[in-house]
Amino acid sequence: MLIEFTKMHGLGNDFMVIDLVTQRLDLTKDLVQLLGDRHLGIGFDQLLVVEPPMRPDVDFSYRIFNTDGTEVEQCGNGARCFARFVQARKLSFKQRLRVETASGIISLTTDRYGWVEVDMGKPKFEPSEIPFTPRAITKIQNAYHLDVNGTPVQLYVANMGNPHAVIKVDDVLDADVETLGKAIESHPAFPERVNVGFMQIMNQRHIRLRVFERGVGETQACGTGACAAVAIGIREGWLDEGEDVRAQLYGGSMVIKWQPGYSVMMTGPTAFVYEGVFSPDGLMAQAGIKPNPES
C-alpha cells in the first residue's frame, strides 16, 4: 500500500501533510518517528494530518505530530499550510475553514494571494493554564525567575494552544538557543515540557524571534511562538496593541495582531515543495520493525 503525501513549509518551518480523509493509515509512534527522520524517511519539523470532522460545526480535524512521535496541541505555521492543502486537494472550496485541534477550534481564512490568516484564540497567562508550576520560583509582576542549572533566568509564560516560555534578549543572534532552550524545555516546572522563545524588541511594531520547539529543537519559524511573544510584548507594554506587529524569524516574517480580550490573529505565507508516496510497511521493514497487520 502506498500513501500519498505533500511537503510544505511556512517560512521554512517544514511539514509533511497527509490526507486521511480519502486515505487510510494507522499512524503509530514508530511510523511517525521513521517518517520524521531526514535520512531514513521523509523528514519534517511536524507531521500534519487532515481527518474528517468529529463534530458537525467544523470542517476537518487537524492533528499534529512532532518528529519524536508525540502528538501536540497546536501549530500556527502548520495551520496555514493545512488551509492551503485542503484547498489544493479539493477537499474543500471554502475560503474560511473551521478546524478542530487538540486544543480547540480555530478559524483559517485564505486570501487570493495564498496568504492565510489564522484566528489563534485568546492567549492564556495563568500558570495552571500553561501548565507551569512555579513553586519556589521568584515572580516579579508578570516575569518569573527560573533556576536553570544554577543560573536565574527571567522569562514570561503564555499558552497559545500549546505552552510557551519567552525570554527577552538584547540580540537574538547572541542567544544560546540550543543549550538554554533545551534546558528550559524539559525543566521540571513545565510538566508537559515547553516551547522556548527568545525575543528581541526592534521597535513597537517589530520583533526578532528564535524558537526552540518542544520535541523538535530550533526551527526556522514558529507561528504559535510568534503569537505568544507578541502577546507577552503587548501585555508588558513593549509592543502596540491592536496593530500589525512584524515577527521576523530565520525563515521570514509573519504579521501578528492582538487586542487584549480578543483572539490573536496571525497572517503569513505558505509554500508547496513537492508531492510523493511512501510505503508504511516498507519503511517499517527497513527499520526492522514488524508492520501492523491492519495497516
UniProtKB/Swiss-Prot annotation:
HAMAP family (UniProt xref): DAP_epimerase
Keyword Hydrolase: no
GO molecular function, one term: diaminopimelate epimerase activity
Quaternary state and interactors: Homodimer.
A biological process term (GO) from this entry: lysine biosynthetic process via diaminopimelate
Feature type site, description Important for dimerization: 274
Binding site for substrate: 13, 46, 66, 76-77, 162, 195, 213-214, 223-224
A Pfam family that the UniProt record links to this protein: DAP_epimerase
Reactions this protein catalyses: (2S,6S)-2,6-diaminopimelate = meso-2,6-diaminopimelate
GO cellular component, one term: cytosol
Cellular localization per UniProt: Cytoplasm
Site feature Could be important to modulate the pK values of the two catalytic cysteine residues, where: 164, 213
Main function: Catalyzes the stereoinversion of LL-2,6-diaminopimelate (L,L-DAP) to meso-diaminopimelate (meso-DAP), a precursor of L-lysine and an essential component of the bacterial peptidoglycan.
Keyword set, alphabetical order: Amino-acid biosynthesis, Cytoplasm, Isomerase, Lysine biosynthesis
Pathway per the UniProt entry: Amino-acid biosynthesis; L-lysine biosynthesis via DAP pathway; DL-2,6-diaminopimelate from LL-2,6-diaminopimelate: step 1/1
Protein name per the record: Diaminopimelate epimerase
Residue numbers annotated as active site: 75, 222
Family that this chain belongs to: Belongs to the diaminopimelate epimerase family.
EC number(s) given by UniProt: 5.1.1.7
InterPro entries associated with the record: DAP_epimerase_AS, DAP_epimerase_DapF
